[in-house]
Amino acid sequence: MDGVRAVLLAGGEGRRMGPLGRGRLKPLVPFGGTSRLIDFSIANVHRSGLRDVLLLSQYEERRLMDDLHLVWNGRHRGFRIDFGPYDAVYRRSPGKLPEQLPERIWPLERGTADALLTKAEYVFRQGDAEASEILVLHADHVYRFDYGDMIREHRASKAALTVSYQRIERRYVHLFGMVEFDGDGLLTAFEEKPDDPTSDLVFAAFCLFDAATLRRYLEQLRGTDWQHDISRDVIPAMLAGGELIRGYEVKSYWEDIGTVDRYHRAHRGLLRADPTLALSDMPLTVAPEVPRHLVPGGPGRRASVVAADVANEGEIVSSVVYPGARIGVDAHVVDCVVLPGARVPDGTHLASAIVLEDGSVQQCEAEREEVAL
């Protein structure tokens, strides 16, 4: 896949996640008992045979880069995370963290398109050559995917842009970017979070641009009265400009973890009789030395993902319990997510909740649909 520059946008602060997002970077929110949100997109890039992915972030970027450098770089031969203007410093520190980073000299970005503009010298380069395509990804989407087929179709069609999309229930379309296509698979409409949806297709938020075309539209939009956003500005401008834009349907599981209730619902999906993702489909980056098991039934646990080192003296039902957690004597945990190292006190009864690392509890809206036991 020479010429493809993978770019990972990781600017979220996690404000809509409530206590779960407080004090932590949203990309590093744990997920599935195995990993963090950002690890899914990184693993997908690695799975697709691309040799690196450029991280674009600004909110507590040192903290995020340090984490990813230790977790990912040097662990997979021939693959690494590129930190753009900071990359040379990290390359000189394999397996450890640099003492100091270069001073930030570029302005703060106001949106996803701004991130591409301010770091253009890194975005549009692939190794020592100009990139031919830019693969734009986000850090809070949960899915297992190989981008190879999408890249091949994009190149064969000579499209200026290929957008991923998925079919969902129309009542949820207003939460996403709505897309429509003609009989030839060409994009005819793109509307971010429509009030009155006319389609059941939504933008799955990863896309592949022809690099030269993307750069041209970014330069055209620069200095105008725009929202500095890929979905609200760049894609609509390309559509209005008559560019060839094709769609690529995502038929497998994909989830945008935008709120704590979506986060909780996504965990419930892992426990179904036909899980949305198998444990083996998820990156293993949180305490990778500890085995995990999907336990259908047994003493003190039913239909749950439980790490092997969990100290359980209570009852775990339809829950995901991370490494290092402890469930106290006669405690009952039902339909919950228990984060790494969390303690559930003796005699506690919890349902439809997230137990944070410090033991505090964040309630979630209960779902009508029951998890298969």
From Swiss-Prot:
GO terms for molecular function: glucose-1-phosphate adenylyltransferase activity; GTP binding; metal ion binding. Keywords: Antibiotic biosynthesis, GTP-binding, Magnesium, Metal-binding, Nucleotide-binding, Nucleotidyltransferase, Transferase. It catalyses: valienol 1-phosphate + GTP + H(+) = GDP-valienol + diphosphate. It comes from the Bacteria. Its cofactor is Mg(2+). Its EC number is 2.7.7.91. Pfam families: NTP_transferase. Substrate binds at G177, E192, K193. GO terms for biological process: antibiotic biosynthetic process; glycogen biosynthetic process. Involved in the biosynthesis of the antifungal agent validamycin A. Catalyzes the conversion of valienol 1-phosphate to GDP-valienol and less effectively to ADP-valienol or other NDP derivatives. PANTHER family: GLUCOSE-1-PHOSPHATE ADENYLYLTRANSFERASE LARGE SUBUNIT 1, CHLOROPLASTIC-RELATED (PTHR43523:SF12), GLUCOSE-1-PHOSPHATE ADENYLYLTRANSFERASE-RELATED (PTHR43523). Belongs to the bacterial/plant glucose-1-phosphate adenylyltransferase family. This is Valienol-1-phosphate guanylyltransferase. It comes from Streptomyces hygroscopicus subsp. limoneus.
